[in-house]
């Protein structure tokens, strides 16, 4: 059986050797060039492949069409991935006749994602394992071929646990590879209800929080001790790395019978530190520039004394809040995002918009700073605040379909030209930008689900001017990506899929046709006019509750471990798919059950209209728009939870309660 192998790390070498022993014809090996600055304690896949006289490659982008074609020409029967760090595209996964298989270092579906050996130790697990599974487009989500359990002892570190997993993986592969070769495997679907995702870890994640229990801190130390960068703390301005420790119970560590504050040094020989629960004896460690030594010698070298405190870097104890600049802060996303950020004391918000009705409730908050202004005029204010702030969100855009055909040049000027200035300022001042792309960039993509990394972006002919919004946003996406690749711009692109909820827009906007679909439908119900179904309302969309969407966006801004940097993330709810006609029916049901129903006119029915008469000749519609949310799940540990019926009811309730009572009465009388 012909095999192509994607491999890295010790497990990659184990996989190669197992394939050789099982009699596979290894056509090629793909691996990674070693990253500078990384501690390479593991064996080299490139060297192992060379010793087997197998062609070996380390492309920067293995999913590039050139490499896909080269793999296609080899016509593999099977593909194996052993700790390869890049997600393989569907184009590659579909090439082998018998499929693709991956070896993952956990008992799937738990601990999908990155660094599972480290994460199980951090979380205090007593068991982990290795899993051989079929590869699908979602990382670590395919059907299971087989898995083996690895027991975790209290003294295990990431290195010893990795050794156990390596031995277990070799045994598992020796058992399963012959069955794959003879095509005799049995597959078991993963239980999605048990799935968990974990992102990559960085050296900064080793910072010790002494408020945690001694057991939790010791778990962190075990997870990141040598050969990893180590768990660390600070004595004043000096960094202290802790390599090994042991948990001591409270009764044995009270100073003068009194429990000490977390982080307080209880004794120096042995070196014992108080924790949120119990205490920790530092067995070995070192100062940032010192040698590896015992805990007591470390205490002597650094001048530690009882009751001194370990903790965060002293100069950072009063850490400055993250400053977030929101341009378009009064808009639908802007005002909901402000509300979410203000619930977290770590953030300070600076906002600009041409009005303030939606954010009036925040104007007295000392962490919210608002200026009324226009992004096309207040260039100096914007540049100054880009320099001042940490995270930039330019949310200003014309984003209603009728405007794409009615005012295409204005759409281009605002959505592209004005936002390009902001992007360039972020590059100039080295600021992180979280940019609102759009589901519109996928255009008429024919994929079942729109994938950020693989789906084609398909738009219509030039005479269909509705696409000017889509291509303006797409070009900015590409410019931002290029600035990231060439100038080191830190960015995240997020693509909202039909977010709905209170304060979406206004009924006045709907009266001139410049609103979202649900607002237009609500206006029809409020005024007693027929609901217009453009081209019959068969178009399907996936509607996302604003609270679900904002929580995902908040996690992007939070950006734990930097894992959102350089990423494109769809934020939508693929389970809430409905046609516009179905949305209208759902809205009507909610409207008829609403306590204010009797204050509004009778329902005037549905009528079908052509898109050209409603939007203009330059319009072209899209049959469906369904997001893949694998990136959001993987990077944000996020999934939408709010059902569409709840979102529709809450959105309707908001609009009905904002209608002027006198106006509502007048509407009823007029229609009567």
UniProtKB/Swiss-Prot annotation:
Active site residues according to the UniProt entry: 104 (proton donor), 440 (proton acceptor), 625 (proton donor)
GO BP terms, alphabetized: lipid A biosynthetic process; lipopolysaccharide biosynthetic process; response to antibiotic
Residues the entry annotates as binding UDP-alpha-D-glucuronate: 399, 404, 438-439, 466, 498, 532-541, 619
Region described as Dehydrogenase ArnADH: 320-672
Catalytic activity: UDP-alpha-D-glucuronate + NAD(+) = UDP-beta-L-threo-pentopyranos-4-ulose + CO2 + NADH; UDP-4-amino-4-deoxy-beta-L-arabinose + (6R)-10-formyltetrahydrofolate = UDP-4-deoxy-4-formamido-beta-L-arabinose + (6S)-5,6,7,8-tetrahydrofolate + H(+)
Pfam families, alphabetized: Epimerase, Formyl_trans_C, Formyl_trans_N
Region (Formyltransferase ArnAFT): 1-310
Record-annotated site: Transition state stabilizer: 102
GO CC terms, sorted: membrane
Binding site for NAD(+): 353, 374-375
Residues of the site described as Raises pKa of active site His: 140
One Gene Ontology MF term: carboxy-lyase activity
UniProt cross-references to InterPro entries, sorted A to Z: Arna-like_SDR_e, Bifun_polymyxin_resist_ArnA, Epimerase_deHydtase, Formyl_trans_C, Formyl_transf_N, Formyl_transf_N_sf, Formyl_transferase-like_C_sf, Lipid_A_modif_metabolic_enz
Protein residues bound to (6R)-10-formyltetrahydrofolate: 114, 136-140
Keywords: Antibiotic resistance, Lipid A biosynthesis, Lipid biosynthesis, Lipid metabolism, Lipopolysaccharide biosynthesis, Multifunctional enzyme, NAD, Oxidoreductase, Transferase
Keyword Lipid metabolism: yes
SUPFAM superfamilies: FMT C-terminal domain-like, Formyltransferase, NAD(P)-binding Rossmann-fold domains
Parts forming coiled coils: none
Subunit relationships: Homohexamer, formed by a dimer of trimers.
Stated role: Bifunctional enzyme that catalyzes the oxidative decarboxylation of UDP-glucuronic acid (UDP-GlcUA) to UDP-4-keto-arabinose (UDP-Ara4O) and the addition of a formyl group to UDP-4-amino-4-deoxy-L-arabinose (UDP-L-Ara4N) to form UDP-L-4-formamido-arabinose (UDP-L-Ara4FN). The modified arabinose is attached to lipid A and is required for resistance to polymyxin and cationic antimicrobial peptides.
Similarity comment text for this entry: In the N-terminal section; belongs to the Fmt family. UDP-L-Ara4N formyltransferase subfamily.
Name of protein: Bifunctional polymyxin resistance protein ArnA
Organism of this sequence: Pectobacterium carotovorum subsp. carotovorum (strain PC1)
